């Protein structure tokens, strides 16, 4: 994905303010609630039977934080997303068999969570930059599927 210097700045400046655990847990929780078929990849997480159970599930919150830590790795390597996510792509493709469309869904939810948390600070230009980033990450994660 090609990001301009301004877009890279928009991403990195906002990233420094993101509450990783809260935002990651919220994003993964929303994915599981809005797209319930995605929960099949998380059967070992325990109770995911309703929104309250999902959003209060410590394993969901912990894995969501882990996802955002991986986004932090992406932000440190904006010019090499495929290399950054090569091992995760292989894991999700070969071992977990995750539908790569799910990466796009989660990326869009992350953008929604950021917009909600940052309000007016999450400008149109910031949203454009983040949409490009999450699309690039989704593409990098889907790389081993091609």
Curated annotation (Swiss-Prot):
Q: In which tissues is it expressed?
A: Red blood cells.
One GO term of the cellular component aspect?
Answer: blood microparticle
Q: Does the keyword Transferase apply?
A: no
Q: Which residues carry this modification: N-acetylvaline?
A: 1
Asked if Heme is a keyword of the record, the answer is yes
Q: Which residues carry this modification: S-nitrosocysteine?
A: 93
Question: What quaternary structure, including any partners, is listed in this protein's UniProt entry?
Answer: Heterotetramer of two alpha chains and two beta chains.
PTM-bearing positions, type N6-acetyllysine:
59, 82, 144
What family does this chain come from, according to its entry?
A: Belongs to the globin family.
Task: Write down the Pfam families for this protein, in alphabetical order.
Answer: Globin
User: Residue limits of the Globin domain?
Assistant: 2-146
Chain positions recorded as heme b binding sites: 63, 92
Q: What is this protein called?
A: Hemoglobin subunit beta
Any GO BP annotation: hydrogen peroxide catabolic process
Positions of modified residues (Phosphothreonine): 12
Report the InterPro entries cross-referenced here: Globin, Globin-like_sf, Globin/Proto, Hemoglobin_b, Hemoglobin_oxygen_transport
Instruction: Note the Gene3D superfamilies from the entry.
Output: Globins
Q: Which SUPFAM superfamilies match?
A: Globin-like
Q: Which UniProt keywords apply?
A: Acetylation, Heme, Iron, Metal-binding, Oxygen transport, Phosphoprotein, S-nitrosylation, Transport
